[in-house]
Design a protein with these regions (language model features):
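Extracytoplasmic c-type cytochrome modules immediately beyond a signal peptide or single-pass transmembrane anchor
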Residues: 1-51
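A general structural signal marking secondary-structure boundaries and capping sites
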Residues: 10, 38-42, 71, 100, ...
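Sequence/structural segment immediately N-terminal to covalent heme-attachment motifs in c-type
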Residues: 43, 47-70, 85
Length: 131
């Protein structure tokens, strides 16, 4: 759970880290439930169809569905990233690649280390189009 990772220092963010400091497990579960029920909107981003196709191919090649399941819907502690903001996906993948983010037991760091900037761009285009 991302909130726990902020609280325990496995993820760092100047805003989120202090906000999670006093949260109980029940508080975090309540917040997670609330946000998981919100409908994602991504009206401003216009994906490039060619990049989406390349993103689908790269997702298949790197076996993203093994952890994130089909269409990046997530499971257990593996987050749903379908429909996530393009810029967030790019930043997250680059952070894993640079080992600036390490709350993944090494899985995402390992996968991201194989991605080029073009791969990251294409994956972000694809992921941002999913619901």
């Amino acid at each position: 759970m991302q909130l726990r990772d902020f609280q325990e220092g496995r993820r760092e963010n100047d805003m989120m880290s202090p906000m999670t400091a006093g949260l109980s497990k029940a508080d975090m579960q309540e917040l997670a439930t609330y946000f998981s029920e919100q409908k994602l909107t991504n009206k401003r981003f216009k994906a490039d169809p060619e990049k989406v196709k390349k993103g689908i191919a790269k997702a298949d090649e790197t076996l993203c569905a093994m952890c994130h399941l089909g269409e990046f819907r997530g499971q257990n502690e593996i987050p749903k990233v379908a429909g996530q903001n393009y810029d967030y996906v790019v930043k997250t993948l680059k952070d894993f690649k640079a080992k600036n983010r390490t709350n993944d037991a090494g899985n995402m760091t390992s996968v991201a280390s194989t991605l080029s900037d073009e791969d990251i761009d294409n994956l972000a285009h694809y992921i941002a189009t999913l619901n």
